């Protein structure tokens, strides 16, 4: 793949996402706090300053927002306006509704919303950070490869 994945967040899920995405040959860039940077040895690059998305000077194919902050709506808007093809937010259904309302109120078009994935990931009934990361990365690979997300046994004719 060698597509660039920018993960903005910290903690266990961000750590697992970084590690698993690296195994899948994504070029992983993590934006996190200075105190957290040692947690991401498999990242190609770590950004520790409060860089706005509009100031990022490299191409981003996938963006995962795993911060659970009140700024998730603004950051999602920035990512969509920047034209990032996959903007995924780790969020509850309630939080997703709030973000979607914000995006629509701020002029995000239906076409732009096609690139917004929240809650991000496939429905695996994931319970652990590892399972959540698998769900998210499975969705990204499915979209990149034009997969259906169906069980293989259900598509054998």
Language-model segments: residues:
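Short, flexible coil/turn micro-motifs enriched in small/turn-prone residues
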Residues: 4-6, 83, 116, 128
